[in-house]
From Swiss-Prot:
Keywords: Methyltransferase, S-adenosyl-L-methionine, Transferase. It comes from the Archaea. InterPro entries: 4pyrrol_Mease (IPR000878), 4pyrrol_Methylase_sf (IPR035996), 4pyrrole_Mease_sub1 (IPR014777), 4pyrrole_Mease_sub2 (IPR014776), Dphthn_synthase (IPR004551). One of its GO terms (molecular function) is diphthine synthase activity. Its EC number is 2.1.1.98. The lineage of its organism: Archaea, Methanobacteriati, Methanobacteriota, Methanomada group, Methanococci. Belongs to the diphthine synthase family. It catalyses: 2-[(3S)-amino-3-carboxypropyl]-L-histidyl-[translation elongation factor 2] + 3 S-adenosyl-L-methionine = diphthine-[translation elongation factor 2] + 3 S-adenosyl-L-homocysteine + 3 H(+). Pfam families: TP_methylase. This is Diphthine synthase.
Length: 255
């Protein structure tokens, strides 16, 4: 049996009772934290909560050695843990599919993810369009996909959730400041008047924690603001309902 369980967003207290129950029964627990990470806790605290040791896999081992993980689940009960929800990342979906192809029982335990946590903004979830990811610019790699996604969503009046790059192995987490700067750099190159310093944006910091940071304002005012420790994400709002306007006014710190 393969149990795929999410750990939630922030700390070990996000672990569900269902995950705790299965953790007691399984033979071995694996985890990966390259797609997301719980910044409010430590591996030691998670292991203490589950009362079992955890083998952490890096990106390469998850993506290229999943066969070993799946083969173990043929005659053993294996748990695979991820931050957030276990079925958000494509890699995790692939693991579940390959396990089922081999006739392995797959149990999926859902958990809070950024897709549910953005409800804290008061923005209506059905008005979010396609999600995009903003990555750290590299000398030969600076994708403009986020710009195109925002452009297409704005045409339809939709909000855009921008996930920010995570390089957990380097302990490097893109800040909202860096994400906004990257978007402005793409605008500077494309010059299609999609984003500017006058564009309003929302920043969510430490989603899932007891005291998340919610900030709203023009990009020119947000870009140098200190949003505190990661993880951050950015939302470019589309057409706002009056209730959403109230949410941005009263639930957020307006910069």
């Amino acid at each position: 049996m393969l149990v795929m369980a999410g750990l939630g967003l922030y700390d070990e207290r996000d672990v569900t009772l269902k995950t705790l129950d299965f953790a007691k029964k399984v033979d071995k627990i694996y985890a990966e934290f390259y797609t997301a990470i719980l910044t409010g806790t430590s591996m030691e605290k998670i292991e203490n909560t589950l009362q079992k040791p955890i083998t952490v896999l890096d990106r390469e081992k998850v993506e290229y050695e999943t066969n070993k993980l799946i083969e173990e689940a043929v005659d053993k009960d294996i748990m695979f843990l991820t931050a957030g929800d276990p079925m958000v990342a494509t890699t995790h979906v692939d693991i579940a599919v390959e396990a089922r192809k081999k006739g392995i029982e797959v149990v999926i335990i859902n958990a809070p993810s950024i897709y549910s946590a953005i409800g804290i903004t008061g923005l209506q979830l059905y008005k979010f369009g396609k999600t995009t990811s903003v990555v750290f610019p590299e000398p030969n790699y600076f994708p403009e996909t986020p710009y195109d996604v925002i452009k297409d969503n704005l045409k339809l009046g939709y909000h855009t959730l921008c996930l920010l790059d995570i390089q957990a192995d380097k302990e490097r987490f893109m800040t909202a400041n860096e994400g906004l700067d990257a978007l402005l750099k793409i605008e500077e190159k494309r010059n299609e008047n999609v984003i500017s310093g006058e564009t309003y944006a929302a920043v969510v910091a430490r989603a899932g924690s007891i005291k998340p940071g919610l900030y709203y304002g023009k990009i020119k005012d947000l870009i140098n603001y200190d949003f505190g420790t990661p993880l951050h994400c950015v939302i470019i709002p589309g057409k706002l309902h009056f209730m959403e306007e109230d949410a941005l006014k009263y639930l957020f710190e307006n910069i």
